[in-house]
Amino acid sequence: MVTVEDIRRAQRAEGPATVMAIGTATPENCVDQSTYPDYYFRITNSEHRTDLKEKFKRMCEKSMIRKRYMHLTEEFLKENPNMTAYMAPSLDARQDIVVVEVPKLGKEAAQKAIKEWGQPKSKITHLVFCTTSGVDMPGADYQLTKLLGLRPSVKRFMMYQQGCFAGGTVLRMAKDLAENNAGARVLVVCSEITAVTFRGPSESHLDSLVGQALFGDGAAAVIVGSDPVVGVERPLFQLVSAAQTILPDSDGAIDGHLREVGLTFHLLKDVPGLISKNIEKSLKEAFGPLGISDWNSVFWIAHPGGPAILDQVEAKLGLKPEKLRSTRHVLGEYGNMSSACVLFILDEMRKSSAKEGMSSTGEGLDWGVLFGFGPGLTVETVVLHSVPINN
């Protein structure tokens, strides 16, 4: 007689969840950060606000961002002046864009990941889709299933309105799915388009202006599964553990509200301080069981909320400058793409590790950490193990 325990044992995978492929995509429209203040104040009819423009210029200069990609073009914004005002009803116009474009950009990234994975898409058993850009029913997960031609029986999870920490959340969810379902292959997609948050400047809300200096568009996809098929599937990173926590005394530090005017973001100045003050506790909880307490001995993938967060984390933990190299590279080349960022950094790290002849996908190191920070303040901590590179 078969018992429930027997069935349960057979349902579980044997090994840890692994990232098997990564794909990324951006809109074609590329924006140069050095000329963006002139463009932004022109397109929002705000050139008369010279003091505010000077402040914005300084924000852009300090951002450490070289360029960003944006779906919104100058032509489109000229035709939709409500989206260039600071607080004009414009949700319908914004929704019309993102409901269509978020799944499409996600498809581009997913196709690249599926191609690298090397298996037929019919073997995808689960889909986890995450976006902070727009809300619809049926969701972006449904639209992507149709766009990619996935099986109708694929098990879908849709995560809307989570914000910048969610790149860690999707990996945590994919890990649980892969390890608890033998043979599961989870397609994870984060797709973000700033059409919901773009707005003109305001003297009274400089935190909104910070977002306009940082946010960019992008989508990233990964395939996650346990027990890779030898010779067919090539693991890149193992997902060893995952945790989420709400930081103490951080209520209201980062808020986002969906209104008639679109998605409004509100930031407190002490966000970098709150994160850097509490980050070591998360590290100790994650790496204590492994006997690791030297934060320079692990590779780093941190959501680049902005340069101030990275600078303060680096200073607080005494990190060597090269630790956040991949993180800063992605911030510089793409800006803050919310949930998609950490997956872009994961991709950058494995590529640069191979290119530079390092012994593992984690810059030659075995253990690594992936951090997501976002509204709450919520922090996601994922412990990674690299895979040897056969150079």
UniProtKB/Swiss-Prot annotation:
GO biological process: flavonoid biosynthetic process; polyketide biosynthetic process
N-terminal signal peptide: none
Source organism (scientific name): Perilla frutescens (Beefsteak mint)
Gene Ontology molecular functions: naringenin-chalcone synthase activity
Broadest EC class assigned to this enzyme: transferase
Pfam families per UniProt: Chal_sti_synt_C (PF02797), Chal_sti_synt_N (PF00195)
Catalytic activity as recorded in UniProt: (E)-4-coumaroyl-CoA + 3 malonyl-CoA + 3 H(+) = 2',4,4',6'-tetrahydroxychalcone + 3 CO2 + 4 CoA
Active site: 164
Biological role stated in the UniProt entry: The primary product of this enzyme is 4,2',4',6'-tetrahydroxychalcone (also termed naringenin-chalcone or chalcone) which can under specific conditions spontaneously isomerize into naringenin.
InterPro entries linked: Chalcone/stilbene_synt_C, Chalcone/stilbene_synt_N, Chalcone/stilbene_synthase_AS, Polyketide_synthase_type-III, Thiolase-like
Family: Belongs to the thiolase-like superfamily. Chalcone/stilbene synthases family.
Domain of life: Eukaryota
Name under which the protein is recorded: Chalcone synthase
Pathway: Secondary metabolite biosynthesis; flavonoid biosynthesis
Keyword annotations: Acyltransferase, Flavonoid biosynthesis, Transferase
EC number, UniProt record: 2.3.1.74
